[in-house]
């Protein structure tokens, strides 16, 4: 349990701290994607919420584009018939990494977006995802990738878009059974291992998944393992820059280590330890109070 708590804590920190990378677009460029079916009042509300600059480039995302990447991954009813998810991408300085924030997104966590965007090759950007009312958040990734292509003048290969979307959805589904933080940790660690030592066969891939899950204290069903084997086989065959993925993960770890050695990091860790102690003491107290008392 202690190992698992530490692993989840480190993974949360890994994705909270910006993953370092490089970008070609100009620092400060802002691209906004608006769902095509937003009403005018909703558009204005979203833009105000984003504090969008007047010179921001605005593009729209259609429901058809959302279905292109999500069909077959989640029920069509969940995708819906209206595109309302919106996002703002602000290009950061070289090496600033990814910083994702969300609002009204109920199923996909910001760490899941970060992990999927790394797979898609998105880097060095501050990202804000929102909707006028609570939504699952699955459709937003389509807009994010489209906006990044416009801002960076780079094309994300279609097979990479599809596998990044599948990664996001499968991580969210897995999060329902093992918890979102554990799901993100599992997928990130498997990708790191694949970048360093690509498995050659399905048996190798299964062994890798089972080993990483065991190391993180996670129990997977046979169905979940097979689903992950399918996902990572698609990643192996997609046009993914594994050197970049590995580089971002390595630099993020270096940044995490520096943070943990800083006064801010030490204070943060101590606060976590204090909270865990309080929880443990509360549990002990609850068990003690529930023990039968002997009458004297």
Predicted regions located by residue number:
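Charged, long alpha-helical assembly modules
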Residues: 218-296
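N-terminal, leucine/charged-rich tether regions that mediate assembly and partner docking
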Residues: 22-126, 150-151
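Sec-dependent N-terminal signal peptides of Gram-positive bacterial secreted proteins and lipoproteins
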Residues: 1-22, 276, 280-283
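Soluble non-cytosolic domains of exported or imported proteins
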Residues: 37-41, 103-111, 134-142, 154-159, ...
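Solvent-exposed, polar/charged alpha-helical surfaces in well-ordered, non-transmembrane soluble domains
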Residues: 44, 111, 115, 142, ...
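Soluble oligomerization/assembly scaffold segments of membrane-associated complexes
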Residues: 118, 123-218
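Second-shell loop/turn segments in exported
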Residues: 30-34, 98-104, 127-134, 172-176, ...
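Terminal amphipathic/targeting segments at protein termini used for secretion
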Residues: 13-25, 99, 146-149, 203, ...
């Amino acid at each position: 349990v202690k190992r698992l708590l530490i692993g989840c804590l480190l993974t949360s920190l890994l994705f909270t701290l910006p993953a370092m990378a490089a970008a070609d677009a100009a620092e400060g460029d802002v691209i906004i994607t608006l769902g095509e079916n937003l009403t005018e009042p909703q558009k204005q509300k979203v833009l105000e919420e984003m504090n969008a600059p007047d010179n921001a480039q605005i593009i729209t995302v259609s429901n058809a584009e959302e279905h292109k990447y999500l069909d077959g991954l989640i029920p069509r009813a969940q995708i819906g018939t209206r595109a309302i998810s919106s996002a703002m991408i602000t290009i950061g300085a070289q090496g600033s990494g990814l910083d994702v924030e969300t609002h009204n997104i109920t199923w996909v966590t910001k760490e899941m977006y970060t992990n999927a965007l790394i797979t898609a090759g998105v880097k060095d950007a501050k990202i804000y995802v929102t909707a006028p009312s609570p939504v699952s958040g699955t459709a937003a990734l389509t807009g994010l990738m489209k906006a990044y292509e416009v801002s960076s003048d780079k094309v994300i290969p279609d097979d990479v878009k599809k596998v990044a979307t599948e990664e996001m959805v499968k991580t969210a589904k897995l999060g329902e059974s093992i918890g979102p933080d554990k799901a993100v940790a599992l997928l990130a660690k498997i990708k790191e291992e694949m970048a360093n030592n690509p498995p050659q066969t399905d048996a190798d891939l299964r062994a890798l998944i089972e080993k990483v899950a065991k190391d993180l204290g996670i129990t997977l069903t046979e169905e979940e393992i097979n689903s992950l084997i399918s996902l990572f086989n698609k990643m192996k065959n997609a046009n993914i820059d594994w050197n970049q993925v590995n580089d971002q993960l390595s630099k993020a770890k270096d940044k995490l280590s520096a943070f943990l050695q800083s006064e801010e990091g030490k204070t943060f860790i101590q606060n976590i330890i204090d909270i865990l102690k309080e929880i443990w003491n509360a549990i002990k107290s609850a068990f003690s109070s529930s023990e039968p008392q002997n009458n004297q």
